[in-house]
Amino acid sequence: MQSHIKILSTKVLSPASAATLENKGASVFQHNFIKTESILTDADAGLVNSLAQQGLHVIFTSANAVYAVAEKLQFQPKWKVFCINGKTRKTIEKLFTKVQILDSSPTGELLAEKILAHSDVRHIVFFSGSRRLDTIPGALLHAGFNLQEIVVYKTSLTPVQLDENFSGILFFSPSGVESYFSVNRISKETALFSIGPSTTKALKNYSGNISECSFPSEEELVGIAYGYFFPG
């Protein structure tokens, strides 16, 4: 392991997360390798608010989707929610005070299994992003669900070429992986840290030196990198 630790985060970290590594002497480089933005128009607000008046089952797999929907709501929905753990669930609990979270999971695959286990659920609304994976929609459609998907935000790649040889790199999404490796390479010694299974799957195209979070959060990901570089 090299003497001076250089860590790249493919998403700008909170000051506290960056300080966790910097306080041990690591150099932390940060860049948002993807950009997300709501694509819901004022015209879409009517549909969102109409759905909010119905006691629907809905899916959120990203905090970005939660923010996009919340921005257009005129009142609190009374939805029954399935969501991804970590930041997505925390954002739902913060912004949607009247919803009922029926189930949450750390991955899309596990979340799909939990939704399928609810035999009373046959119609469901999925608030998704433009680059979402097919894991959940594929499983639900295969099982005969009436799935209404509404794309509420888009993800754009914002790569930057870096000449540094990093000790470790933090990845937060498959899109972030695609963005980084579109203009960069790594050495075989570089340790990669993944927020979850979908990101890990994308990283396996480039390396086998991958550590994955057991819980999808920035704090957990930084903690894994901390334990890797500063054990004991």
PLM features: residue spans?
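Signature of uroporphyrinogen-III synthase
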Residues: 1-232
